[in-house]
């Protein structure tokens, strides 16, 4: 659970911004989206491999540039 304490003289906007950052860093939304529907393990592994391949290609292109 993500929680944020309000500091003295802190505006609601700043408090909300801090909460959103903590929420995003905690990975709550990412985990929720991941569990929204079932993905077969074989498909999940295939997607992970393709993501890895793309990431490696981008890194390789950046090194060559």
Swiss-Prot record:
Keywords tagged on the record: Ribonucleoprotein, Ribosomal protein
Signal peptide bounds: none
One GO term describing the cellular component: ribonucleoprotein complex
GO MF terms held by the record: structural constituent of ribosome
GO BP term (any one): translation
InterPro entries (alphabetical): Ribosomal_bS21, Ribosomal_bS21_sf
Gene3D superfamilies: Ribosomal protein S8
Domain of life: Bacteria
Transmembrane segment boundaries: none
NCBIfam families: S21p
Family: Belongs to the bacterial ribosomal protein bS21 family.
Name by which UniProt lists this protein: Small ribosomal subunit protein bS21
Native organism taxonomy: Bacteria, Pseudomonadati, Chlorobiota, Chlorobiia, Chlorobiales
Gene name of the record: rpsU
């Amino acid at each position: 659970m993500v929680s944020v304490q309000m500091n003295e003289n802190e505006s609601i906007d700043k408090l909300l911004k801090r909460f959103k950052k903590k929420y995003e860093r905690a990975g709550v939304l990412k985990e929720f989206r991941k569990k929204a529907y079932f993905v077969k393990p074989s498909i999940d592994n295939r997607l992970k491999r393709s993501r890895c391949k793309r990431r490696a290609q981008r890194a390789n292109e950046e090194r060559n540039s």
